[in-house]
Amino acid sequence: MGDVLVVFRVLPEDVDNDLSRLESKIREKLNGVCKINDIKTEEIGFGLKALNVQAIMPDEEGMADRVESILAGIEGVSQVDTKDISLI
């Protein structure tokens, strides 16, 4: 099996959350679980921003769900959605 690139949209709990701090927490929690390819800020509207996390992981059953659960458990995260999955 190969690897997959999964894009997660991470929404903060509040518009006032420090996204750079949240990005650091994401990198810390996912260290050793998967490889972070990139993290980009996405403007949602009305001052709300989200982080699009591109993660590379093995194409194993349940791996994307595991990473999504880790992201959802980070303090300051309101919601996590899987936006895209691509085989690489």
Curated annotation (Swiss-Prot):
Asked whether the UniProt record includes Protein biosynthesis among its keywords, one would answer yes
**What InterPro entries does its record include?**
eEF-1beta-like_sf, EF1B_bsu/dsu_GNE, Transl_elong_EF1B/ribsomal_bS6, Transl_elong_EF1B_B_arc
Name a GO molecular-function annotation.
translation elongation factor activity
Keyword annotations for this protein, in alphabetical order, are: Elongation factor, Protein biosynthesis
Matching SUPFAM superfamilies, A to Z? Answer: eEF-1beta-like
What would be one Pfam family of this protein? Answer: EF1_GNE
- Give a yes or no for keyword Protein biosynthesis in this entry: yes
Give a short account of what the protein does: Promotes the exchange of GDP for GTP in EF-1-alpha/GDP, thus allowing the regeneration of EF-1-alpha/GTP that could then be used to form the ternary complex EF-1-alpha/GTP/AAtRNA.
> Which NCBIfam families does the record cross-reference, listed alphabetically?
aEF-1_beta (TIGR00489), PRK00435.1 (NF001670)
Instruction: Show the HAMAP family listed in the entry.
Output: EF1_beta (MF_00043)
- According to its UniProt record, which protein family does this protein belong to? Belongs to the EF-1-beta/EF-1-delta family.
Q: From the Swiss-Prot or TrEMBL record, give the protein name.
A: Elongation factor 1-beta
Q: Which organism is it from?
A: Picrophilus torridus (strain ATCC 700027 / DSM 9790 / JCM 10055 / NBRC 100828 / KAW 2/3)
Q: Please name the taxonomic classification of the source.
A: Archaea, Methanobacteriati, Thermoplasmatota, Thermoplasmata, Thermoplasmatales
